């Protein structure tokens, strides 16, 4: 969710850096696209299985041209099955078919065609649903909103509140959603379990290709598809596009599968999963999204109390998928216990990112994700210069060309970065091919606890600990050819138990390039020791954090180099792409900073941390004022 975005991770470092170097702080933009406070499922659910194309408990949806589309299919069992399903078609709308379901584990077969759900997109709201801001019987207290720090423009006509209680979602499902699957029929009790006929619903496209069935929101609603407390839901074999917030949104759900889905051309997210467990995302293709293609945020924190590097189990698995041509391929605040493997994250601005920044998200600080056996490469797309600076993203949403490849980044992120860990713990980045990322192959830095409204002094340094990056191939393609990263590993020297070892590199002697000013040590010896984060390294993020694509002044903040395209690395080794990392050498972390000395740097860190504690409270008050 925008509220859970990784990339304003800069906000955190920016605050600290600005204080340390005398910066003026941040101007807090307006909040937008809030969501209700969410909780984790109880973990008793399970991953559902596909019920096939012959489930007797089914509904069939078709369009007027479905017959012609089926006629053009090549002969074979799939064509015969589609012709048989066509004879049973009783619905022209997916939502209408969902509304007719009376028993769990019902399949909704969607025949080839384009579905805009005009009936529901244009349906007149009831008196109650049209006046939720003042008339809601189940209002959502502003204090419980999961808020936002950015203020993208709104392409939808949102005259009412956009953070609704679950009870109001049930009563007004089309206020924000084109298609809504709401499984909890008892919204007024404390349970979030799926307990009604929509449990186990399967939405299945019956075409040969994922693009044979297209669900086109046309920016009519905030979300194209919402599955809320819908345990056992299964999505398969279709394309969903043109949502302002999420194309496919799964919330507070225990047990789900998203398989062979294309999510494209959305202002923010392709696939967003939040506060969910027992989930599988596989064989998806996400592109042209202004935030991330795949977002597993606040995944069930089943390892939150686990102080071992190995997780007890994972809550969400992502495999055999592609995420490309987005601002980020993958992101997630509190993306806990997520296992992403055998995927391709390429041609985004940043490939993978996770963070512990935003308050209100269950499961903070982030922990125990694993990214292994992925291809993470060529994440150098500069959509800031291509579309934000040129004014394309200032046009009305429907005129920006999202279905022609326009991407309007909602968030600031460092162009040219493969993997970004902003304040995560116990994460494993291993056995990946990370290459041709012109800024950094991997990047890791600390997130002070006050930035998530945690003021217990003992937790100040509770992020950026016990992460391991090992057995990765840096700057080398799978075929063995060279495609250098700008810098293989960037780290702010903060945190305990972090280690980087057994990684190979395209650079001289096969040794990865780093900006490390302290030796983290081997994993077997416990990794890094405690050292306060180097202000010289983090301070450069201040200007970037003020990015706001809807504000002409801050569309490209002055002196922000994150939105500059790094030059393609050459065989001449460089530890300092674009000058963004402090020069590393015998003089240590203060090198390149006139008049800076290690003692001064340490003093600044101490002063800065005290000020951050105060700024956290100011930030919380400013967000409350904006929402009010």
Where are these regions (language model features)?
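Juxtamembrane/start-of-transmembrane alpha-helix segments at the extracytoplasmic/lumenal side
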Residues: 588-606
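C-terminal membrane-anchoring or membrane-association module
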Residues: 608-628
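Right-handed parallel beta-helix
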Residues: 200, 209, 231-242, 254-269, ...
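Acidic, glycine- and Ser/Thr-rich low-complexity intrinsically disordered tracts
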Residues: 34-55, 137, 144, 148-159, ...
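Right-handed parallel beta-helix/beta-solenoid
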Residues: 29-96, 100, 114-131
């Amino acid at each position: 969710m925008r509220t859970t975005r990784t990339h304003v991770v800069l906000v955190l470092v920016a605050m600290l850096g600005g204080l340390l170097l005398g910066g003026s702080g941040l101007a807090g933009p307006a909040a937008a696209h809030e969501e209700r406070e969410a909780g984790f499922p109880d973990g008793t659910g399970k991953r559902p299985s596909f019920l096939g194309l012959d489930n007797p408990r089914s509904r069939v949806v078709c369009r007027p041209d479905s017959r012609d589309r089926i006629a053009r299919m090549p002969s074979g069992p799939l064509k015969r099955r589609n012709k048989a399903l066509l004879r049973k078609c009783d619905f022209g709308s997916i939502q209408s078919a969902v509304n007719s379901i009376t028993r769990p584990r019902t399949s909704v077969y969607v025949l080839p065609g384009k579905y805009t759900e005009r009936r529901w997109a244009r349906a007149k709201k009831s008196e109650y649903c049209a006046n939720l801001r003042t008339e809601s019987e189940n209002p959502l207290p502003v204090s419980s909103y999961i808020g936002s720090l950015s203020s993208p423009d709104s392409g939808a006509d949102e005259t009412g509140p956009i953070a609704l209680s679950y009870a109001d979602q049930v009563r007004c499902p089309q206020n924000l959603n084109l298609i809504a699957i709401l499984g909890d029929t008892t919204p007024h009790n404390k349970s979030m379990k799926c307990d009604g006929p929509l449990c186990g619903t399967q939405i299945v496209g019956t075409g040969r290709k994922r693009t044979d069935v297209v669900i086109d929101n046309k920016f009519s609603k905030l979300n194209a598809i919402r599955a809320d407390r819908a345990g056992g839901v299964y999505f398969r074999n279709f394309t969903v596009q043109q949502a302002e917030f999420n194309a496919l949104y799964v919330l507070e759900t225990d047990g789900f599968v998203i398989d062979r889905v294309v999510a494209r051309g959305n202002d923010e997210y392709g696939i967003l999963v939040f506060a969910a467990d027992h989930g599988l995302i596989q064989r998806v293709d996400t592109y042209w999204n202004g935030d991330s293609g795949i977002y597993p945020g606040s995944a069930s924190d089943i390892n939150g109390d686990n102080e071992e590097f190995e997780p007890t189990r994972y809550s969400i698995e992502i495999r055999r998928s592609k995420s490309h041509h987005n601002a980020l391929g993958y992101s997630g605040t509190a993306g806990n216990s997520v296992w992403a493997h055998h995927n391709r994250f390429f041609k985004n601005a940043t490939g993978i990112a996770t963070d512990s920044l935003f308050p209100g998200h269950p499961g903070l600080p982030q922990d125990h994700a694993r990214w292994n056996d992925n291809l993470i490469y060529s994440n150098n797309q500069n959509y800031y210069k291509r579309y934000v600076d040129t004014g394309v993203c200032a046009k009305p949403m429907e005129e920006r060309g999202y279905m022609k490849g326009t991407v309007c980044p909602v968030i600031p992120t460092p162009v040219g970065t493969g993997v970004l860990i902003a304040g995560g713990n116990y994460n494993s980045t291993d056995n990946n091919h990370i290459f041709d990322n012109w800024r950094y192959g991997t990047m890791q830095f600390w997130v002070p606890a006050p930035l998530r409204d945690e003021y217990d002094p003992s937790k100040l340094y509770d992020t950026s600990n016990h992460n391991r990056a090992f057995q990765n191939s840096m700057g080398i393609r799978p075929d063995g050819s060279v495609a250098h990263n700008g810098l293989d590993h960037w780290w702010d020297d903060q945190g305990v138990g972090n280690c980087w070892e057994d990684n190979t590199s395209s650079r001289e002697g096969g040794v990865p390039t780093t900006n490390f000013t302290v030796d983290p040590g081997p994993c077997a010896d416990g990794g890094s020791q405690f050292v306060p984060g180097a202000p010289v390294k983090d301070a450069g993020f201040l200007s970037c954090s003020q990015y706001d694509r809807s504000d002409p002044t801050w569309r490209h903040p002055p002196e922000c180099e994150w939105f500059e395209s790094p030059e393609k690395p050459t065989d001449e080794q460089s530890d300092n792409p674009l000058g963004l990392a402090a020069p590393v050498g015998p003089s240590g972390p203060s090198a390149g900073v006139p008049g800076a000395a290690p003692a001064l740097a340490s003093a600044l860190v101490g002063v800065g941390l005290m000020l951050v504690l105060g700024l956290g409270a100011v930030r919380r008050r400013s967000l409350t004022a904006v929402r009010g």
